[in-house]
Swiss-Prot record:
This is DNA-directed RNA polymerase subunit alpha. It is an enzyme of class 2 (transferase). Residues 1-238 are annotated as: Alpha N-terminal domain (alpha-NTD). One of its GO terms (molecular function) is DNA binding. One of its GO terms (cellular component) is DNA-directed RNA polymerase complex. CDD domains: RNAP_alpha_NTD (cd06928). It comes from Anaeromyxobacter sp. (strain K). InterPro entries: DNA-dir_RNA_pol_insert, DNA-dir_RNA_pol_RpoA/D/Rpb3, DNA-dir_RpoA, RBP11-like, RNAP_asu_C, RNApol_insert_sf. The keyword tRNA processing does not apply. The gene is rpoA.
Length: 340
């Protein structure tokens, strides 16, 4: 058991207020995430770790081999088919799959011309989902016929064709190099974050692009879980339980003195100040109880004003959407709060 005094090594470090997701740009293939404030240096430490794990360690699915009836190797052509086998293989590499099992799955093409074969025409079972059904694979002319069988499975990272060879496969089976990773790109940026009057903390901004088989937020969560599991082996002690914090009755809790200040003291832009006045918001305590959605419904109040207010409140350790019991209190604290 570790001495409680020693635990101050990590408990005294500042932690992010939470992970903020940019809802305006969020999609099934892109996400932008912000974590702040972080201790100096932790932005690069966490950003680089998450980026490397995202790119290398998340599982995805891909086609790993193909066998086309009448074809012995990838440099042949198929009668009445516009693409040669090499082009068909390149197109198969770009088929996006989601496989809901760890088993190797079989996918087939059975078609007669004239017909354009797209990813949505692949014959699969219920455990295989094609995510880009409009993706072009090959074109069959009049009188043409294609019968092909492919294997697909889940995996991690990039696997060259040589490693996708299956012993005992029928003659004519062509292994395909596979990119299993569902992550297409990861960027991170570290800038300064402010806590009170100090500006030497880190702000981590992480951007993630995926192929759509995994949501960006889930991808970040999976990567963080992998890092956590890998680091757990280095912890060789149990922590002493901290004594439960005494919960004071609401009326005894000390409120942030800034809550009692007038919104006029925030030195907002004229537009933002007028919006608060029109909404009958007089004190900072009145303001912080409003949610972002409620503020955006205020006449002439836009996202620029929202950003301005959120940044000023953050400097005071406050935020929108707070719940203040018994507000306003019977008596405001004596003296004023310092200006921002």
């Amino acid at each position: 058991m570790v001495d409680p005094i020693v635990t101050k090594n990590w408990r005294d470090l500042i932690k992010p207020r939470g992970l903020v997701v940019d809802q305006d740009s969020l999609s099934n293939t892109y996400g932008k995430f912000v974590a702040e404030p972080l201790e100096r240096g932790f932005g690069i430490t966490l950003g680089n770790s998450l980026r490397r794990v995202l790119l290398s360690s998340l599982q995805g699915a891909a086609i790993t081999s193909v066998k086309v009836e009448g074809v012995e190797h990838e440099f042949m052509t198929i009668p009445e088919v516009a693409e040669d086998v090499t082009d068909i293989i390149l197109n198969l590499k770009e088929v996006l799959l989601q496989i809901h099992t760890n088993d190797v799955k079989t996918i087939r093409i059975e078609a007669d011309g004239p017909k354009e074969i797209k990813a949505g025409d692949l014959i699969t079972d219920a455990q295989v989902e094609v995510l880009n059904p409009g993706h072009h694979i090959l074109t069959i002319s009049e009188g043409g016929r294609v019968r092909a069988e492919m294997t697909a499975r889940r995996g991690r990272g990039y696997v060259p064709a040589e490693r996708n060879k299956i012993p005992g496969s029928p003659i004519g089976t062509i292994p395909i190099d596979a990119l299993f990773s569902p992550i297409r790109k990861v960027n991170y940026q570290v800038t300064n974050a402010r806590v009170g009057q100090q500006t030497d903390y880190d702000k981590l901004t992480l951007e993630v692009w995926t192929d759509g088989s995994v949501a960006p937020a889930d991808a970040v969560a999976f990567a963080a879980k992998i890092v956590k599991e890998q680091l757990s082996i280095f912890i060789n002690f149990d922590e002493a339980e901290e004594p439960a914090e005494e919960i004071k009755p609401v009326e005894e809790q000390k409120l942030n003195e800034n809550l009692f200040r007038s919104v006029d003291e925030l030195e907002l832009s004229v537009r933002s100040a007028n919006c608060l006045q029109n909404a009958n918001i007089k004190t900072i305590g009145d303001l912080v109880q409003k949610t972002e959605a409620e503020m955006l419904k205020t006449k002439n109040f836009g996202r620029k004003s929202l950003k301005e207010i959120k940044e000023i409140l953050a400097e005071m350790g406050l935020s929108l959407g707070m719940k203040l019991e018994n507000w306003p209190p019977k008596a405001a604290p004596q003296g004023g709060a310092p200006k921002v």
